[in-house]
């Protein structure tokens, strides 16, 4: 279902967008130890410099930096970078999960699921004509693998600080920068060269729904669990549709089956009507 698939993608990306936005708004991401000099004590710095350097930097950049109230702690610990790296890894992992789904759902065309068709971007093989590989999702998968590795690097670098200083900020900054750039390019590539051209293989999807035994779950509220189990066993044994067996047994009318086994209703987020939800709430 195109609408359902789009909603799923938006939900996943939206969650990560919220996480990154929350991270951006967190005060510690804008804290600076500037003015603390060597180890955060402010040695050899004038009070005028210590008091004015951060406000002047904020004015010059337009970024609302604030000076840490504990310059020693901010100099010793670089955990704020770890929070950013973790959020970046979470976003990459979510995108990689989407790409895993795309690769699996597009597998085929004969022996896989074949529920969706990805745009062909290059010849898949020099020895097998017609072979098409999901190269764009694979690219984003590999970007995610690299970003997860970067996060491990950042974690170890943050942990490796000793006493008043952390000497490993160069690899922290390089890992974060590389990860941010790669993820930005990966998202653009996935969107432009894959997602915009994805189409549903409607015939395959329709056939899979019709032959699925799992749809018997939608009949449980109407015919009961035991009767539904019996239908499932019969459908598996005879390789016949669940709906036809239910109709033959007189368990449901054809109209009831059309309503209960409607793919759109079964895949919607909640099949309860607003009035039913209100009624349930009223009984609680």
How should each PLM-predicted stretch be described?
Residues 2-13:
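Conserved beta-strand signature within the Rossmann-like core of class I S-adenosyl-L-methionine
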Residues 4, 25-27:
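N-terminal functional modules and adjacent low-complexity/disordered segments of proteins
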Residues 14-15, 237:
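Short Gly/Pro-enriched loop/turn and capping motifs at secondary-structure junctions
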Residues 16-23:
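C-terminal substrate-binding/active-site "lid" region of AdoMet-derived donor-dependent transferases
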Residues 21, 28-284:
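Conserved, well-structured ligand/cofactor-binding cores
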């Amino acid at each position: 279902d195109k609408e359902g698939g789009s909603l799923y993608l938006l939900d996943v990306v939206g969650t990560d967008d919220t996480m990154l936005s929350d991270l951006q708004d967190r005060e510690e991401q804008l804290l600076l130890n500037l003015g603390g000099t060597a180890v955060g004590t402010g040695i050899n710095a004038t009070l005028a410099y210590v008091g004015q350097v951060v406000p002047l930097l904020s004015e010059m950049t337009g970024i609302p930096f604030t000076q840490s109230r504990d310059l020693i702690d901010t100099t010793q610990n670089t955990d704020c970078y770890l929070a950013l790296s973790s959020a970046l890894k979470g976003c990459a992992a979510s995108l990689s999960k989407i790409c895993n789904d795309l690769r699996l759902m597009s597998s085929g065309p004969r022996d896989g699921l074949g529920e969706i068709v990805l745009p062909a971007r290059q010849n898949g093989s020099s020895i097998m004509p017609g072979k098409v590989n999901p190269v764009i999702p694979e690219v984003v998968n590999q970007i995610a693998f690299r970003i997860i590795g970067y996060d491990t690097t950042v974690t170890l670098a943050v942990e490796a600080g000793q006493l008043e200083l952390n000497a490993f900020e160069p690899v922290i900054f390089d890992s974060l920068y590389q990860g941010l750039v790669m993820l930005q390019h990966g998202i653009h590539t996935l969107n432009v060269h894959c997602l915009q051209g994805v189409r549903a293989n409607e015939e395959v999807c329709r056939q899979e729904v019709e032959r699925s035994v799992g749809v018997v779950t939608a009949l449980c509220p109407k015919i009961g669990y035991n009767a539904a189990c019996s239908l499932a066993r019969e459908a598996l044994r005879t390789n016949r549709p669940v709906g036809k067996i239910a109709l033959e047994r007189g368990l449901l009318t054809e109209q009831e089956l059309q309503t209960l086994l409607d793919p759109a209703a079964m895949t919607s987020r909640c099949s309860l009507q607003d009035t039913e939800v209100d009624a349930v709430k009223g009984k609680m």
